[in-house]
Amino acid sequence: MNERTVVVRRIEEGIALDRDYVALPEDYGKDSYFQRPDIQAIRSLVFETLDILEEKTGFRRKIEESRQVVIKPNLVSVYHRSGMFEEDYPESTDPRVMDAVVEWVQKYNKKVLIAESSGKPMPTATSFRISGMDRIAGYRNTGLVTLETCPVRRYLLPKAKVMKEVLIPTPFVGVVEGKDFYISVPKLKTNLYTRVTLGFKNAMGVIPYALRERNHNYRIDEKLADMLYILRPDLTLIDGLVGGEGNTPAPVDPVDCRLLVAGTDPVATDRVGCRIMGFDPDEIPLFREVGKRGFYHGEAQVDGEVPVFHFRPADPSLLGDTFHKHFPNI
């Protein structure tokens, strides 16, 4: 067994994945949905990826022994043709992937909780409704919770640099105490603040809004490293079916990557996702910071090919290249 194994699997060309990657269609839960070629291919990909990772690491036993499994997607201003925009932006976890992950997990533990507090300004309940996460919860008989509405418990982090205290919503207290199994299912995408945003940054959506805003500045890399002292995913599955390049949390452009990345070491898994986007993790301050803290234990053993897509990086300048392209005289 090698706990730092990372599995990468892709869907072959020819199966269109650019349909319903932000929001589930109306026929979700019916035969017409589950018989679609893309849905069958995604389900097979999720099952293959997790089956191989289980064979390599044996994480299933911890799922079986846990009180429940808490699965956190990454929902960021889900606007699925909702009258605000014409386009679909690949910023949120693909609900087709989430559905397959829940189905796989329930083979080993029936008690599953989908938990999220999506980025402003979209209320999480609205994000659940638009994306279809509420229907996944209903169809699969899971719990569903908006974390911003939950009571919190205060923890002190003596080793932290900037997050000396943290408020954890009660659905994640079992994760902190080692009773529950925590799965992070982020989107493969770039980010304006941290260059990339993947599995362990997804924990930012756990803490209350006021704490997210605190040190959400040039010290954000230290803040995210601090979070690993208390919230470390037991399993990370990165949704890279349709990646997002650009200035998250602003709208991003789709990248047809057609892959999933999964691992039980959150830092090693995120480093593989970073390389897939075409970035050297050693040149990204966030990964350097977590390395200084001792959370990085060397490169993972990768099962599968690691393609490189050269995502367009986020542009943090006030007036970026796109602006100057359209307004060259300013």
Regions found by a protein language model. Name each.
Residues 1-330:
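N-terminal and secondary-structure boundary signal
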